[in-house]
């Protein structure tokens, strides 16, 4: 077994003098010097030293410095006061000079009163005169005076035979002036309404292609000019293009307009207009839209056209047959299919044949929407 030896010293340790930092000692000396000179504030000084400094009388050099500083401050205050007084005096002089032309220097009592009155008169004459109120145009009294003066001057200058013309002029003036100026001329209630003709071509969708979907729409104005003619891609898959009748082929659907956008464009054109069509209910069904009956003209339901074509009124004639009979024109010919633009133009020309008579009939028997 190894033994452990411990050397313990129970005596008091030797006290070493704490020298401190030389830089700190220099700072303390400078601080004491500044405190003695009075450059440090009372907050930075301990209370014991502050009381000593206050109790000690100032030295000769310090008193001279304080006196010089106080003299400089007093001089600066005096200069500021003098400058302020000069400014006030200059402003008062300017005010007096600006108002001197209103108050003349009186030599005697009578002269001063007369001068004041003259100046007041000049001042009032220089002021702008108030404008007189003019009477309203619709008032009756000034009109009578003007008419009387005009008649008197005209009678003096002209003979008796020439007095009739100014009387007529005055009558016209009275009639025009009696009418209120704010009212505009009345607009006729029955304005000519805009009219368009429409024709649509369909393709077969749904089971076995039995559902008719819109594939082309053409709209022409009253003069036959084309307003709208677009191929339209239906939302459903096309089973039968019906090219023999519609003229629609697969290539026409490549860049065709979608149904929703085409429908919104078409309805904007039709809104508020008289729409002419042949068997137009089929076109409205393909558009998923129904126009007001009062603004719809269906040439397949007008008996006047059947009468002109020497056909029974109760029979629904095709557009091709009516065009051949009444317009002496052949449409829908060839194997390329129908043209919706051609059909719309033919429909409009057929309606123009009976437009006046049919519109009178509708005015007497308006259709119920």
Curated annotation (Swiss-Prot):
Pfam families: RNase_T (PF00929). The keyword Secreted does not apply. Keywords: Exonuclease, Hydrolase, Nuclease, Nucleus, Ribosome biogenesis. SMART domains: EXOIII (SM00479). Transmembrane segments: none annotated. One of its GO terms (cellular component) is nucleus. Residues 36-68, 80-107, 125-188 are annotated as: Disordered. Residues 129-146 have a biased composition (Basic residues). Its EC number is 3.1.-.-. Residues 42-54 have a biased composition (Polar residues). Its main location: nucleus. InterPro entries: Exonuclease_RNaseT/DNA_pol3, ISG20_DEDDh, REXO1/3/4-like, RNaseH-like_sf, RNaseH_sf. One of its GO terms (molecular function) is 3'-5'-RNA exonuclease activity. Residues 81-97 have a biased composition (Basic and acidic residues). GO terms for biological process: ribosome biogenesis; RNA processing. Residues 194-369 form the Exonuclease domain. It is found in: Nucleus, Nucleolus. 3'-> 5'-exoribonuclease involved in ribosome biogenesis in the processing of the 12S pre-rRNA. Displays a strong specificity for a 3'-end containing a free hydroxyl group. PANTHER family: INTERFERON-STIMULATED 20 KDA EXONUCLEASE-LIKE 2 (PTHR12801:SF78), RNA EXONUCLEASE REXO1 / RECO3 FAMILY MEMBER-RELATED (PTHR12801). This is Interferon-stimulated 20 kDa exonuclease-like 2. It comes from Rattus norvegicus (Rat). The lineage of its organism: Eukaryota, Metazoa, Chordata, Craniata, Vertebrata. The gene is Isg20l2.
